[in-house]
């Protein structure tokens, strides 16, 4: 979160006191600087994948399967991480299944909850009234379903698709957590099922990083006696082939970042090339988005250093100069900047030029202008926070959030992510939609801002920092820190409800775009769930290694 941590020089030309953040260094050394893609292995995977894809496509479109079986097949494809190969076929099937759905009395809780989750994930608004038959006259869950671990687990995952006004799903969420925790502690679950439940309680499907969750599910599915070997084989091959591609991309990014050598000129900043690529891969992991991933990663890296400049190094006067330079977006503005800022400013202009050239080759450069404007907006808001800090000003919570929804990077990340999508998906209308400040982008930004405020609060206040949302709420409402945290988490949950509702049909823009906003929101849940995993990358180190280094045994 950006804010000036220091005042200006005390007198004359004396060097100002700078309250450095002392961020942890990069974990990776030269670990990702070299990688040679095994083209023979990549081709071998690819050839078998193409054969298996046709077999699975035939499964998806084949008739004669009961609705519950078809929904389960779609669920397995999604959880194995291979549904992106069959998007058209799956959407056609779901449209038919939703139109024909009947609340069959024979459907158990697992099946009803699975229908609910899959339909809502794809924009179909199934009513939560479908769960009424599992409650007694006192509106409590019947005992027969309370001890059904598969049913409870399915309902638990379904509750994450709730929207505003669905109090039943709030109750169901709390109830299923309590039941699942109790069942895990009991003696009746197999070790495999217990492991699956514990993972779900730690990370839900809906809010998880799709590629990481696919890898987890593959390990569970492999132990399932009813598994389909064709699906399992496809999932393993697909994960490993895509991992090779991602590793090669990461190597290119890592070398580019090392050659840029910006950190040596701004050593106060977080060195997070690998983590930014991890972030970008969550936004879109599919192989056709390699150019987009590279562009998004580079922009995120420059934003990260800019954030740290405002947050943990620059004086107020220096920051004003930098804000003005970014608004001008012209190399001549560099002359007015201190030396360390010149390096950052030059890198910023060059990165956007690189990204624009790469996208121009594919006829998609028109989005770059929107990303630049979003970057300018963030820097203006960073300066507002720097002024607040200099003046010791604690904003009202509403005033804080108005500015924080900009510094949360929701607009910039969404715009920069859209730049890397196909031209017929990320149209000029899509970028204009972002300019309307849509509820979904605001909700995504609120999630990121508020969860970061909670998780990084103590550390930031220890070194001196502008008042965060937590501080503003505490002062305005006269409540304790813990009480404020409870209220902020209520806001986070409401933001998730808004995201879910914005993804229900009819949607404002293509679902292919909205899923990217959802993915950007998921990053906050994964990276900031227990601590600020971006500032402290050891928290997500295992995720990075799992995603980019460790293949799935064949």
Swiss-Prot record:
A matching Pfam family: Terpene_synth_C
Pathway recorded for this protein: Secondary metabolite biosynthesis; terpenoid biosynthesis
Cofactor(s) the protein requires to work: Mg(2+)
Protein residues bound to Mg(2+) 3: 452, 456, 460
Residues annotated to bind Mg(2+) 1: 307, 311
Protein name as catalogued: Valerianol synthase TPS1C
GO MF annotations, alphabetized: carbon-oxygen lyase activity, acting on phosphates; magnesium ion binding; terpene synthase activity
Organism: Camellia hiemalis
CDD domains, A to Z: Terpene_cyclase_plant_C1
Motif (DDXXD motif): 326-330
């Amino acid at each position: 979160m950006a804010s000036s941590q220091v005042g200006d020089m005390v007198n004359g030309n004396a060097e100002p006191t700078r309250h450095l953040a002392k961020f942890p260094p990069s974990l990776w050394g030269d670990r990702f600087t070299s990688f040679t893609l095994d083209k023979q292995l990549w081709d071998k995977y690819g050839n078998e994948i193409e054969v298996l894809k046709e077999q699975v496509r035939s499964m998806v479109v084949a008739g004669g399967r009961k609705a519950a079986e078809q929904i389960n097949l779609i669920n397995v494809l999604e959880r194995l991480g291979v549904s992106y190969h069959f998007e058209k076929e799956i959407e056609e099937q779901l449209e038919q299944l939703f139109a024909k759905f009947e609340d069959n009395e024979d459907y158990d809780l697992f099946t009803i909850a699975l229908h609910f989750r899959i339909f809502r994930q794809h924009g179909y608004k199934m009513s939560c009234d479908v769960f009424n038959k599992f409650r007694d006259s006192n509106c409590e869950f019947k005992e027969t379903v309370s001890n059904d671990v598969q049913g409870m687990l399915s309902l638990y995952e379904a509750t994450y698709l709730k929207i505003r006004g669905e109090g039943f799903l709030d109750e169901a969420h709390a109830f299923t957590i309590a039941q699942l925790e109790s069942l895990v502690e009991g003696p009746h679950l197999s070790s495999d099922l217990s492991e699956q439940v514990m993972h779900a309680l730690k990370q839900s499907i809906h809010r998880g990083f799709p590629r990481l969750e696919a890898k987890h599910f593959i390990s569970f599915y492999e132990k399932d006696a009813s598994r389909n070997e064709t699906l399992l084989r496809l999932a393993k091959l697909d994960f490993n082939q895509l991992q090779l591609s991602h590793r090669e991309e990461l190597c290119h990014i890592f070398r580019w970042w090392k050659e840029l050598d910006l950190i040596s000129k701004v050593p106060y900043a977080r060195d997070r090339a690998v983590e930014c690529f991890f972030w970008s891969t969550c936004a879109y992991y599919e192989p056709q988005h390699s150019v987009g991933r590279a562009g998004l990663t580079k922009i995120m890296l420059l934003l990260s250093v800019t954030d740290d400049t405002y947050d943990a190094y620059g004086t107020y006067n220096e920051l004003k100069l930098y804000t003005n330079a970014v608004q001008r977006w012209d190399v001549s503005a560099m002359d007015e900047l201190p030396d360390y800022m010149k390096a950052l400013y030059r890198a910023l202009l060059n990165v956007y030029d690189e990204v624009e050239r790469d996208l121009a080759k594919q006829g998609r450069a028109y989005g770059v202008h929107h990303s630049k404007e979003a970057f300018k907006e963030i820097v203006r808001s960073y300066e507002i926070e720097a002024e607040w800090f200099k003046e010791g000003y604690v904003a009202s919570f509403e005033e804080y959030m108005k500015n924080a929804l900009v510094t949360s990077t929701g607009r910039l990340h969404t715009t920069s992510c859209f730049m890397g999508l196909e031209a017929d998906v990320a149209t000029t209308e899509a970028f204009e939609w972002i300019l309307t400040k849509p509820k979904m982008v605001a909700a995504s930004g609120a999630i990121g801002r508020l969860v970061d405020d909670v998780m990084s609060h103590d550390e930031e206040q220890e070194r001196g920092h502008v008042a965060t949302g937590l501080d503003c709420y505490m002062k305005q409402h006269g409540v304790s820190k813990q009480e404020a945290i409870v209220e902020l988490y209520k806001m986070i949950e409401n933001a998730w409800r808004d995201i879910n509702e914005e993804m229900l049909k009819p949607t404002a823009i293509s679902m292919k775009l909205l899923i990217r906003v959802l993915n950007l929101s998921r990053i906050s849940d994964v990276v900031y769930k227990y601590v600020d995993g971006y500032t402290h990358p050891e928290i997500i180190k295992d995720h990075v290694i799992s995603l980019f280094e460790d293949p799935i045994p064949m």
